[in-house]
């Protein structure tokens, strides 16, 4: 099948709805380069000014494949987005649909004028259900929808595609208003709701409520697409609950020109997504229905209570928090720690039994953790990520700085035959050294020479590598985690002696 969309013959009939995966230009470029089935790439919604959005948690699962979210329109602002989107290499058979929002008609116009030159089309977010004063608040008023659409059309020369809310008694009336304003196409639907989820007596989302998406909204999405097309005859991007080839066929049967797949991607790696979209396209081509078997309906987003038993201060801005039980997290995986009313952040577990983690004071959440009282009940969800699997005959070299030791300690502990390199500015910022020495050959460096080698940990690493034979170096696998400059410096040294495929890194932000 071929998909024609505003003068382009698309490489595929799918899009990923705004705000789900394609939230950064690096990811957008990856989709352009590796996922041809996604013919329309939709950006996250962009406003006039930078916006932080809501504190985590921003996503909750209330049933397998069914979610509520309240991200809160997080974005870097229009001017920064112009620079970022302008760097993209958009293939001739793809369509870059830039989603925009505003708090007024005038803001929509200003954002549209800025972003149109770096876009193939503009999606007007008139349907976000969880950001007060934006989106749905405007999209439920036909006159406002008509006026905003007309005002944007008057200042740009690319297609304008309003995204409609299902949270209205008559979506056909809203669709007709958009068409009267000059809309070139429509997108239906955005999330339902807002809805509410709770865990252990607390609202999960920091916003309290959020838009509902996933399998549960499919029947409403299909109904809305049919009503919108019947009312306007415009091309429609159909979104809401599609996860299988049967769902996609239902959207096409309803009249959709392009189909959005979003919630079905939750929990997938980029490689998983490539395989999923490839299978979904093959299903359509050969009247099969296998792609849904790749959807992660097994994702566990439940929170488990843990109680703080120790808060050990390492120095002014580093602490080790130890909790009262074991959690099942393997080397290379991470968890989310949630404290109701404060927020949620991802952490590598320093140890799994008992569960402990390392905190560095970088923001409101971690600042509060520094003095978290013993006895505090918190909640953990996960693990997430992919466990590491070094080759059986590998010699592990773990390089850590800051709180990065938490990401690599379990690798050395669980697989053995390891060196651990730990770097810090000074001795008072070092921690967990005795435990490291019990499981690996330990190498310590401090910038001021107050402990171990006097200098950068990468200098110590280079010395160790230079004293090894080619055969020994060929068996090495490196795991780096720490501040970005340290990680990049470690990678540079490692590439002097070993192949890039032997190196695995994570930046500790």
Residues covered by each model-derived region:
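N-terminal capping/small domains of soluble enzymes
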Residues: 1-96, 102-103, 276
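Catalytic cores of alpha/beta
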Residues: 25-33, 106-117, 168-181, 225, ...
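C-terminal helical cap(s) of enzyme catalytic domains, especially alpha/beta-barrels
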Residues: 34, 53-64, 197-210, 252-253, ...
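Glycine-rich phosphate-binding active-site loops on the catalytic face of alpha/beta enzymes
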Residues: 43-48, 125-132, 185-195, 241-275, ...
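Glycine/Thr-rich beta-alpha phosphate-binding loop at enzyme active sites
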Residues: 67-70, 75, 129-144, 174-234, ...
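Glycine-rich beta-to-alpha transition loops that act as phosphate-gripper elements at the mouths
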Residues: 99-103, 164-170, 234-246, 508-509
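FNR/FR-type flavoprotein reductase catalytic core
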Residues: 364-508
């Amino acid at each position: 099948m071929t998909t024609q969309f505003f003068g382009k013959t698309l490489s595929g009939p799918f899009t990923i709805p705004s705000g789900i995966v394609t939230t950064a230009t690096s990811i957008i470029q990856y989709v352009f380069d590796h996922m041809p089935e996604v013919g329309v790439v939709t950006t996250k919604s962009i406003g006039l000014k930078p916006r932080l959005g809501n504190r985590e948690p921003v996503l909750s699962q209330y049933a397998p494949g069914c979610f509520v979210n309240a991200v809160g329109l997080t974005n870097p602002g229009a001017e920064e987005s112009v620079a970022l989107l302008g760097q993209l290499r958009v293939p001739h058979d793809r369509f870059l649909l830039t989603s925009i929002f505003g708090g007024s008609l005038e803001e929509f116009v200003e954002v549209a004028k800025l972003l149109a030159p770096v876009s193939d089309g503009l999606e007007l977010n008139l349907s976000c259900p969880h950001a007060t004063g934006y989106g749905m608040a405007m999209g439920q008023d036909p006159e406002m929808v008509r006026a905003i659409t007309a005002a944007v059309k008057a200042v740009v020369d690319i297609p304008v595609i309003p995204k409609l809310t299902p949270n209205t008694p008559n979506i056909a009336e809203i669709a007709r208003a958009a068409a009267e304003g000059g809309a070139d196409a429509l997108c239906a639907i955005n999330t339902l709701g807002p809805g509410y989820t709770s865990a252990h007596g607390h609202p999960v989302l920091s916003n309290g409520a959020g838009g509902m998406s996933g399998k549960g909204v499919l029947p409403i999405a299909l109904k809305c697409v049919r009503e919108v097309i019947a009312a306007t005859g415009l091309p429609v991007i159909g979104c809401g609950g599609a996860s299988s080839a049967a769902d996609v066929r239902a959207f096409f049967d309803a009249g959709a020109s392009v189909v959005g797949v979003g919630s079905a991607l939750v929990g997938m790696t980029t490689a998983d997504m490539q395989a999923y979209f490839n299978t979904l396209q093959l299903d359509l081509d050969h009247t099969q229905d296998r792609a849904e078997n790749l959807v992660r309906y097994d994702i566990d987003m439940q929170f488990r209570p843990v109680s703080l038993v120790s808060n050990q201060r390492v120095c002014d801005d580093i602490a080790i928090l130890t909790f009262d039980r074991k959690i099942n997290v393997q080397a290379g995986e991470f968890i989310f720690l949630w404290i109701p009313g404060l927020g949620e952040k991802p952490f590598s577990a320093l140890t799994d039994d008992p569960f402990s983690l390392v905190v560095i004071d970088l923001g409101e959440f971690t600042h509060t953790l520094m003095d978290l009282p013993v006895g505090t009940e918190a909640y953990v969800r996960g693990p997430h990520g992919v466990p590491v699997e070094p080759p059986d005959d590998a010699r592990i070299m773990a390089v850590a700085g800051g709180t990065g030791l938490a990401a690599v300690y379990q690798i050395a502990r669980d697989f053995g035959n390891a060196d651990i390199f730990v770097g810090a500015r000074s001795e008072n910022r070092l921690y967990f050294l005795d435990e490291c020495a019990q499981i690996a050959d330990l190498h310590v460096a401090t910038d001021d020479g107050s402990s171990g080698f006097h200098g950068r940990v990468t200098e110590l690493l280079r010395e160790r590598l230079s004293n090894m034979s080619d055969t020994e170096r060929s068996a090495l696998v490196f795991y780096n985690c720490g501040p970005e400059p340290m990680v990049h410096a470690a990678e540079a040294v490692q590439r002097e002696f070993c192949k890039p495929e032997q190196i695995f890194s994570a930046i500790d932000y």
